[in-house]
Amino acid sequence: MAAAMMNKTVVVGKESVKGGVAPKVAMSRGGFLNSGIMKKDRDMMVWQPFNNKMFETFSYLPPLTDEQISKQVDYILANSWTPCLEFAASDQAYAGNENCIRMGPVASTYQDNRYWTMWKLPMFGCTDGSQVLSDMQACTKAFPDAYIRLVCFDANRQVQICGFLVHRPPSATDYRLPADRQV
């Protein structure tokens, strides 16, 4: 029986071990083993709950470039969604008790309870991305110290499909690199 066990091969991760008994896998400090692949401790960090404010869809990314915004606008229009620009002062941009309209026992962080000012009307029937981009520039010129976001609506499903920031005030310090958002 012992001789049979000695000839057995056990696979541990990507390595095979002769003798049938797998050695204990040594864990390095700050790492863990997942399917035989060692991960770094930054992959297991805790999300920072303080001063880690987010906006809409792409908040985890660095601020979008003009080219990236243009591609998003093209995607929105290609799907026949209605774009709409909204803006808010820095102190009114985040969901909170001070700038939240209460409709019953709804928490202040519930996103539908926060309203931004609309820039003109939604761009119903818009098929030209340059029109959306020129309105963004006009809104930014009129309100340089405000947050400006682009939201879009699907008329068929009658819902907001997406929303993302297209302008942050120059004084904004809310964006943090993902590595800085963790403890």
Curated annotation (Swiss-Prot):
Protein name (Swiss-Prot/TrEMBL): Ribulose bisphosphate carboxylase small subunit, chloroplastic 7
Additional comment: The basic functional RuBisCO is composed of a large chain homodimer in a 'head-to-tail' conformation. In form I RuBisCO this homodimer is arranged in a barrel-like tetramer with the small subunits forming a tetrameric 'cap' on each end of the 'barrel'.
Span of chain positions assigned to the transit peptide in the UniProt entry: 1-43
Function field: RuBisCO catalyzes two reactions: the carboxylation of D-ribulose 1,5-bisphosphate, the primary event in carbon dioxide fixation, as well as the oxidative fragmentation of the pentose substrate. Both reactions occur simultaneously and in competition at the same active site. Although the small subunit is not catalytic it is essential for maximal activity.
Keywords: Calvin cycle, Carbon dioxide fixation, Chloroplast, Lyase, Monooxygenase, Oxidoreductase, Photorespiration, Photosynthesis, Plastid, Transit peptide
InterPro entries assigned to the protein according to its UniProt record, in alphabetical order: RuBisCO_ssu, RuBisCO_ssu_dom, RuBisCO_ssu_sf
Source organism, top-level taxon: Eukaryota
Cellular-component GO terms for this entry: chloroplast
Quaternary structure (record): Heterohexadecamer of 8 large and 8 small subunits.
UniProt-annotated location(s): Plastid, Chloroplast
GO biological process, alphabetically ordered: photorespiration; reductive pentose-phosphate cycle
Family named by the database record: Belongs to the RuBisCO small chain family.
Species, as recorded: Acetabularia peniculus (Green alga)
One Gene Ontology molecular-function label: monooxygenase activity
